[in-house]
């Protein structure tokens, strides 16, 4: 779960239902990420907190250049490893996150998502659990046609995706305090996008220079090429379903080439007055010798049930819908 607050209300409910939990939040934030697990089956083996603002993505330059960030966001990734009581020596690694929300900061979300995968793989290796599957799920704040999604699942970048990355290679005043606030960024089309709305345009930022350390397009592609490709549980699972009446997917409303991944994600995972899109995913990284099988999925909400917006009584208590999957892994001999 992401954007979790009111722990004094939530934790007793989880405990009554037989769940233990691990909670983590960014510095100074009043909400965070929570992973709950059944106490009868799992116990906490190890944890790791990933602070995206502090993570380095290159080895050259000063500390800011090595981090290569465009915005100090205070977002985190929370990694935990769980021992399975029912299978001796087995377990699962779970990573959850809430990436930076601003729709124009495509580069920063790509940076954060790449760091999350890198650190999840590193964490699994550091605790000698390479044979355990890794589930990476959360609110990624990007749609299936976003550059970050394509980079994660191994699709080549399209020209418009490269353009969104290039125009978001900026440095915000939160990283460089010498930048005056409310200075417009280098996105040429901002004049046509209601520039008075800071939630839809880049402000208080300047174009990145080479000394800022932001990855160039070839460097970003190379960064992701060194990472394992993620598999989306819903994209694969819904792609195998054809007998659910009224089921529509992201590809039903957004044209994607047949070869592109993401077309079978739910049509929406968030449906509010301001945002109607897909933001949430369940990804998996399988161990080398243990392929996964999708046994069942929680059916997405029908769009007709979302048109009045969420949260909505009887539909969803959150402005995001729930995603759930039952998975199995079989170890090859």
Can you say where each PLM-predicted feature lies in the sequence?
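Eukaryotic short linear interaction motifs
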Residues: 7-9, 29-30, 43-45, 89-90, ...
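Amphipathic alpha-helical interaction motifs in eukaryotic regulatory proteins
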Residues: 10-11, 15, 37, 110, ...
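His/acidic metal-ligating clusters that form di-metal
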Residues: 79-82, 91-95, 109-137
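Active-site-proximal segments of metal-dependent phosphoesterases and phosphodiesterases across multiple
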Residues: 99-118, 145-147, 156
